Amino acid sequence: QQSEQLQQKQCQCTSNPRTGQLATAFRYSVEEDRRVYTINYNLNIFSTFIHAKTGVKLVFLLDTGADISILKENSDKFSNIQITNKINIQGIGQQKIQSRGQTFIEIQTGKYVIPHDFHLVDKNFPIPCDGIIGIDFIKKYNCQIDLNQEEDWFIIRPNNLKFPIYIPIAYSSGINTTLLPARSQVVRRLIVSSKDDNILIPNQEIQTGIYVANTIATSSNTFVRILNTTDSDQLVNMDTLKYEPLSNYNVVQANSEHRNKTVLSQLKKNFPELFKSQLENICSEYIDIFALESEPITVNNLYKQQLRLKDDEPVYTKNYRSPHSQVEEIQAQVQKLIKDKIVEPSVSQYNSPLLLVPKKSSPNSDKKKWRLVIDYRQINKKLLADKFPLPRIDDILDQLGRAKYFSCLDLMSGFHQIELDEGSRDITSFSTSNGSYRFTRLPFGLKIAPNSFQRMMTIAFSGIEPSQAFLYMDDLIVIGCSEKHMLKNLTEVFGKCREYNLKLHPEKCSFFMHEVTFLGHKCTDKGILPDDKKYDVIQNYPVPHDADSARRFVAFCNYYRRFIKNFADYSRHITRLCKKNVPFEWTDECQKAFIHLKSQLINPTLLQYPDFSKEFCITTDASKQACGAVLTQNHNGHQLPVAYASRAFTKGESNKSTTEQELAAIHWAIIHFRPYIYGKHFTVKTDHRPLTYLFSMVNPSSKLTRIRLELEEYNFTVEYLKGKDNHVADALSRITIKELKDITGNILKVTTRFQSRQKSCAGKEQLDLQKQTKEIASEPNVYEVITNDEVRKVVTLQLNDSICLFKHGKKIIARYDVGDLYTNGILDLDQFLQRLELQAGIYDISQIKMAPWKKIFEHVSIDKFKNMGNKILKNLKVALLNPVTQINNEKEKEAILSTLHDDPIQGGHTGITKTLAKVKRHYYWKNMSKYIKEYVRKCQKCQKAKTTKHTKTPMTITETPEHAFDRVVVDTIGPLPKSENGNEYAVTLICDLTKYLVAIPIANKSAKTVAKAIFESFILKYGPMKTFITDMGTEYKNSIITDLCKYLKIKNITSTAHHHQTVGVVERSHRTLNEYIRSYISTDKTDWDVWLQYFVYCFNTTQSMVHNYCPYELVFGRTSNLPKHFNKLHSIEPIYNIDDYAKESKYRLEVAYARARKLLEAHKEKNKENYDLKVKDIELEVGDKVLLRNEVGHKLDFKYTGPYKIESIGDNNNITLLTNKNKKQIVHKDRLKKFHS
């Protein structure tokens, strides 16, 4: 700063006779200049000059840290010293030194003379040379110190005069000392004695107060920055310097001004105008973390990926044929990958095919772009999974809080920023016409790539809080609730990118957005919505036409179930069609559900972000089919939804009582919303009042105890919400939180056990609560049942002038007069119900069924009876049986069936049984079953639309031949893999009597080839057959075969189309033969035709299951002689280059039998597997009581005897029982079943 101020002052030259020349600012009298000039030099470099007047060589220290230029005094060399211009100098230690004066000298190089004023100092001044060239000289002549070339130069402009530089070297071993001025930072040249070309000198303190900065060094030429923090000059020993080999690095070009401007220009395209200057500052500071597409992709410095396979056998897949027009594009892309060090040449035995796929076309360019893709499907089959959990989307969305701004950062070629382990690179090999290559980075297409990338990103950004940024794969979204918060979070994320050498794509980064689309969700500062870009897809989604399309639609909607009220209740109609063995029948319920689900996605409910500083509320309800829940929070006096949830009940849950279903809904909702509510107090609201009582019981049932224990860790309050105020639906469809009103006065509050432990006065409140809940019934005590049989056959309570209680509708167990309960012909309902419950209690009756006869209900409505009964009855339930309507008119019958069978909503053209069940619930007429059966049978739509079982004629017993080869069945196998002999098919002939098989390999199945094979290989060996049976293949249905049969007087029978039973005998042999061949050609596919005859021989010498004879024995009259040691077959070593045919034949027969035995074992295993699928085993232990099936009893005897106690359990499911007479009996487990006492 001093030198800049001094240079602004100029004066007339006094020492040079050339008047008018501007002199430097260092020519002042003592009175004028009292400032202190520093000469703390920070470069230990020197250069030699020639004094123009005397020709003496002068060695100067080039010091960019010195304010002035100085020269040691020597009376023999200099004269014309101006004593008046003295200054104070400080820098070598703390002592101030006054200069001797000032002199003007000229430096000469060639024909050029360079004049300058130097301040003279004593000859003992502590510098190891004649003087110092300071910043005044360097700025005056625009000098440059060039240390970047093979030779170092001190350059004086504008004439580019070059003076060589020499630097005293400090060695890292041996003689290694250097002098450091006090409180100064200097740069010293250093040579490190290391076998590594590139080394890292880490930040370290080499002696007290002396520090060395991080330095990337070479063993030959290195500059090190050293800091002396002490108050005295220090002689430093460099032997204590520590260094290490440099690894995991990339050589990149230094950031140039042009490059930085290009990056900023790309970033500015996505800068909002309001925050442009702030973003430009922060991006300029971290300009190095952004990469241009023209630059090589670097790798991160924290994680390498290793690939692990199931075995070491190389996977080699042939290349696909590429069009000639794409060859040039492939070579160009591969060369770029090589240049960017993403791939390298390979000599691996692995190979995966490559192909080009088109990229999405740009609207501004007509040129088609391609992406190079490697098909790693075969590698993926053997690649061991690299399991790392991807973050849950709902967990990410929950962390958005009250975010106001969103910034999206995109990694440049994310997978390619992960380096592959050296030992894993061969697995990724691929090849082109120019050679084979392998990836050095993680390639696209490997099944482990997403999880591996997620692991790397999670590690790299582990210090970033979810409230600052969230990531999913290569989507990195920074959030902020204010401008300052966003800039702070961006700075931290950018810092992580720099720390771990992660590069961002500047063109794909966006900042300070008010909404962003993330994984199909639109995140805004007001809430979360589905991505509206998918609305068109939802609107135009086709109606599912089969189970697969229905499954896809349900899966698509399931992705957005967070936004769909009553998702489970609606989707169950369509989900039912996705189950196995369920015929696909798109009903009106399915269509309504389909339309509703689409409309819910197109017009979604706006969900709120969870605010974890506020209390949550869960509102639940259940229907017979499903349960639902909504998580809400209070925002400005309104309960707004945070999340919806629903699920369909299982079959068992659907059959439970209303109370159990409502309880299950609360239990499931609390577990489901655990991430939101755990560790905080929350409220549960239900419109089922008995649940408030159940959660406050002192001694609950075992079932309730289990549920309460599971919820013991949660801190919540159960509140009863009156039905009229509860807009949470009995299924989730009726949840409409926006209409909830302030209902504080209508809520009965119940405290859970968690809170009761925190209250000192819980006892009195608990007693008051029990008093209240005694009046609460768990279910309605009087309800209606629409029935037919119950009214006509099973009435258990009937009123006339007296009450009659019946047992099973027959035996009267009680009768008593109720005449005293009538006043003016009207029954006193209150007294009647009390007496009814009393009388039922005498006979221990808890539930009765009642027909609403006129005697009671002519003056009392059913609703009044139900309301009164629910208030009075405590321990008795009454089912009111509504009688069905009797129909006699034919037109009414037709109208009823037209509605309940033909109507698309109420009928749906169901079958006879279902239609009859629907009609019986409401109506009755004589011979109704017969009438409905005839109506449905004659329904034209049912006859046309519904499938029926295919008819099958009884099996026909064909004529049995008298001699071998009288009747021969012929068929063709193929195409098979082309053998070395050129064969792809085989003609098979089997004798219908002996089951003797002949197989002939052929090159093709033309008529001529097939006819020649049959004639030469069968007829000339075994003689012509009497009957020749074939299918309708063109190789048999032609003139050549017809002429052959005519010439040899062979009867030719052809099967009908699609009726393979005619040639069933050969079809069954084909299955066995195919298993033989398939089991071998899995290892060698080119010599199946050689092995074919060995397998045929095995087939003919194996006993047939049809007649228990070997086909060979029936044809030749004797059994075939087989080597005796075949039954003791051990490991078989292959024999190659065998000249002895007998040995080779023996070997092939051994292999054939081994494979036959292997197939038989596999067949047994398959049979066991199929059998076990139908087995329902029971678990028994010693001490259990069981019942024993009675195998010798008569029809009227018990099917089981016992119970007996299990004494012991032995092998093979044998169990020892201890009978009632203390005798032991051993029985099989299949005869037992558990006894429930």
Swiss-Prot record:
GO terms for cellular component: DNA polymerase complex. Residues 957-1119 form the Integrase catalytic domain. The keyword ATP-binding does not apply. It comes from the Eukaryota. The gene is POL. Keywords: Aspartyl protease, Endonuclease, Hydrolase, Nuclease, Nucleotidyltransferase, Protease, RNA-directed DNA polymerase, Transferase, Transposable element. GO terms for molecular function: aspartic-type endopeptidase activity; endonuclease activity; nucleic acid binding; RNA-directed DNA polymerase activity. The active site is at residue 63. This is Retrovirus-related Pol polyprotein from transposon 412.
